[in-house]
């Protein structure tokens, strides 16, 4: 959240940027058996953080997105980007040469889809480890005040669960401009009265940054 907010410090005053995460990441203790696995799947940067530093540089990391891949590489993994989303990763792995060794998917407590069983059905030896929890949080007082005051608000939303939590806490978003990382996030707001709902061209940090800047410029001109 802090990294994303820093992209807009030139366009906005400090008090115009409100950081109020709706999810708190809590990492679990790593199992000792983790060091025995030589091929990991990371579908988010939090999965990489949960795994921590690679035991050696021969551990293969199959990653979703540039940010996840770069982080895995910086922590010593032999990291490969296998698509921009889980669907692309699954399709690429199923089309390519089968991986003979065990694969471990490291993900959070709340995850969409069933990647592990889909890979098993495709003939892979795949297991999973829940490396972290995503604990729901209430909006901060400054964030609530902004909604109550009727301010124009730009809301970059990076996950479907975050979107659902926001919708539950703030059912009316008619002064809010929602920046959705994916169609799944945008669809959460189909029946919500919002100022606007826009979907990033690519489901990653770069796509969200680009769209947020564009919407911000339009809102500032209103």
Model-derived features with residue positions:
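Signature of uroporphyrinogen-III synthase
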Residues: 1-222
